[in-house]
């Protein structure tokens, strides 16, 4: 078993794993142990009351965080016609069709999000084995296959996050950076939870959002008292 670093020992000693922290207190605890070497992301894990083995209970979607994620996002767009100029005007970093597909086939993957207009999916569909495993395949459920590519680009650039539960029914995503204010992180978390509540499957019974924990990239999870949200 790997030895705990001094920092991890301090974090574990400073976080009560049996306690649910009020949100502002939870953020204070996170910031107290954040790294001084780089600005860590603030991540969240949300345990949902779903049966992830049932396809009709899986939760997937996207939402724009009011204060963004704190990271720069490069966007590639597959489209043609008038949408080309619209995508570029909205801030897309790469725009194309077959030419863009060829770049990707050569291993040129200098982007974080892929957006496609419906008429471009015949080209994008050929890239499934490349984009799929990386979580980059455009999907209408998260708004990345859309006739309005300009809006999708703006959303991606302004702090849109995508979420999808894992096999244990847990959503893992980012809600900002450790240098965000407590209020910014709280409002981003509230936006995510509101989106998840809206996406609750009709077949899911009982308490839907069962547990919320926040952590920094290299820190321990801090359970949040949902009543403080």
From Swiss-Prot:
Pfam families: Ribosomal_L1
GO biological process terms held by the UniProt record: regulation of translation; translation
Domain of life the protein comes from: Bacteria
Keyword rRNA-binding: yes
GO cellular component: cytosolic large ribosomal subunit
Molecular function in Gene Ontology: rRNA binding; structural constituent of ribosome; tRNA binding
TM regions (residue ranges): none
UniProtKB keywords: Repressor, Ribonucleoprotein, Ribosomal protein, RNA-binding, rRNA-binding, Translation regulation, tRNA-binding
Keyword tRNA-binding: yes
The protein's assembly and partners: Part of the 50S ribosomal subunit.
Record function comment: Binds directly to 23S rRNA. The L1 stalk is quite mobile in the ribosome, and is involved in E site tRNA release.
NCBIfam families to which the protein is assigned, alphabetical: rplA_bact
Family recorded in the similarity comment: Belongs to the universal ribosomal protein uL1 family.
Stored HAMAP family: Ribosomal_uL1_B (MF_01318_B)
Protein name: Large ribosomal subunit protein uL1
Lineage start: Bacteria, Pseudomonadati, Pseudomonadota, Gammaproteobacteria, Pasteurellales
